[in-house]
Amino acid sequence: MIAASLRRMITHPAAGGVLLFAAALAAIVMANTDARALYNAIIYFPAQSASATPSHLSLLVLVNDGLMAVFFLAVGLEVKYELLQGALNSRVRAAFPAIAALGGMVAPAVIYSLMTAGTPALRAGWAIPAATDIAFAVGVLALLGTRVPVSLKVFMLALAIIDDLGAIVIIALFYNTALEPLALAAAGAVIGIMALMNRANVRFLSLYLLLGAVLWGCILLSGIHATLAGVVVGGLIPLTLPSTEVSPARALEHWLQPWVVYLILPLFAFANAGISLQGVAPGHLISFLPLGIAAGLVVGKPLGIVLFTAVAVKLRLARLPAGIAFRHIAAAAMLCGIGFTMSIFIANLAFGHDDPETIVLAKVGILSGSVIAALLGYLLLRAILPQPQGSGSVPVGG
């Protein structure tokens, strides 16, 4: 009886989303109570504290650079299928999430820049609201279970991948991160080998994964966020092979699904959501920095996505994914305002660890904006999506 109930609970379409947010809530509570020392001991294990060098192996590093690369591998596999055989299988449909991602980066940056124009010291933070935390956005979608159409979730995943790539480019160009040319060259060579394997219809999945691990190491050493390796490997694993119905990409995607939903995403949430609000005062909520970030996330993200895609559709540069309308896009675009971990990462680069007060203000804006965007996006989608009628959602994240 208990086993049957547990099985039903685990296999519920919304179980992954519930688990992710439960892990995030546990992290926030621990980080702001007497359990803070225990929380830090867990996420920085085996290091002693957050003061360890970024290269020091810890649970946080393992999750963010290692396990999240696996998550992006699963997302990359899914988006590749949709680009070749699914909801994005034409040029105008594939262009839709790309244009949406562009609008979702430009508009928040503009709004932030306008709201902080009077404070030159804050100009460096323009990219903070341009980022989307794909893990938490997918987590909110998972809470809606099978009500989410396949095409809408695929749109979100494709947009988030492009957004993440955009964030990597922004960080490399504007935030003076040191890149290692030799490691980049090695990564390029590995990508070239995998591309040749794909073209030659090499079917050994283990060989792709082995080279993928090498690519991950090269990208990690290059100074670029290592999760990029997951996207690249997902795009290079063959979807179909001649003279066979076997799909290596689909087989790997289905195998990864439960690991992503029930282990990787909850661990990511727990390791990254523990934001300490110590020292935050009510007055912090109405200063220009948090207001600019929150406005960029809550207003800029959906506004940019909707405006850019509406113009693109009008000019016939893009087409809406099948089965959804602009009201679905507008509601899903609100979820892209969940900046959270990527926004915090950019804030640390923009203002440096030697300016703790500014970092606290930035985190207030990121956390408040992300929570508002998540709640509004969830409520809007819940209002416009039909009640579940069986299956219909895609696997990653829910």
From Swiss-Prot:
Principal location: membrane
Keyword GTP-binding among record annotations: no
TM regions (residue ranges): 9-29, 57-77, 95-115, 124-144, 154-174, 177-197, 204-224, 226-246, 255-275, 288-308, 329-349, 359-379
Localization of this protein: Cell inner membrane
Keyword vocabulary terms for this entry: Antiport, Cell inner membrane, Cell membrane, Ion transport, Membrane, Sodium, Sodium transport, Transmembrane, Transmembrane helix, Transport
Top-level division of the source organism's lineage: Bacteria
Family annotation (InterPro entries): Na/H_antiporter_dom_sf, NhaA
Gene3D superfamilies named in the record: Na+/H+ antiporter like domain
Catalytic activity: Na(+)(in) + 2 H(+)(out) = Na(+)(out) + 2 H(+)(in)
Entry's Gene Ontology molecular function annotations: sodium:proton antiporter activity
Protein's membrane topology: Multi-pass membrane protein
Record has Membrane as a keyword: yes
BP-aspect Gene Ontology terms: regulation of pH
GO cellular component, one term: plasma membrane
Function: Na(+)/H(+) antiporter that extrudes sodium in exchange for external protons.
Family: Belongs to the NhaA Na(+)/H(+) (TC 2.A.33) antiporter family.
PANTHER family (UniProt xref): NA(+)_H(+) ANTIPORTER NHAA, SODIUM ION/PROTON ANTIPORTER NHAA-RELATED
Protein name per its UniProtKB record: Na(+)/H(+) antiporter NhaA
Species, as recorded: Sodalis glossinidius (strain morsitans)
